[in-house]
UniProtKB/Swiss-Prot annotation:
InterPro entries: Ribosomal_bL28/bL31-like_sf (IPR034704), Ribosomal_bL31 (IPR002150), Ribosomal_bL31_B (IPR027493), Ribosomal_bL31_sf (IPR042105). Belongs to the bacterial ribosomal protein bL31 family. Type B subfamily. The lineage of its organism: Bacteria, Pseudomonadati, Pseudomonadota, Gammaproteobacteria, Enterobacterales. Coiled coil: none annotated. Keywords: Ribonucleoprotein, Ribosomal protein. It comes from Escherichia coli (strain 55989 / EAEC). One of its GO terms (molecular function) is structural constituent of ribosome. This is Large ribosomal subunit protein bL31B. The gene is rpmE2.
Length: 87
């Protein structure tokens, strides 16, 4: 491997702001912010969604009340479409 071309791999603290949870993960992300956890200073990155807060991973999927495209079309324009063949 060539020297001095790879980014620095280090432990970074990611803060999921939606659930106020902190994760220490190895990463090469660059940041100017720092935070002190457990007496150690780490690079710090805020995120909006993580696997702990995303509905897909938590199992708290919200139900979508909208219908499919065909059902919406039929509802809006169904009265104009003839149900008889050849008409």
């Amino acid at each position: 491997m060539k020297p001095n071309i790879h980014p620095e791999y280090r432990t970074v603290v990611f803060h999921d702001t939606s659930i106020d949870e902190y994760f220490k993960i190895g990463s090469t992300i660059k940041t100017d912010r720092e935070i002190e956890l457990d007496g150690v200073t780490y690079p710090y990155v805020t995120i909006d969604v993580s696997s702990k807060s995303h509905p897909f991973y938590t199992g708290k999927l919200r139900t979508v009340a909208s219908e499919g495209n065909v059902a919406r079309f039929t509802q809006r324009f169904g009265r104009f479409v003839s149900t008889k063949k050849g008409a």
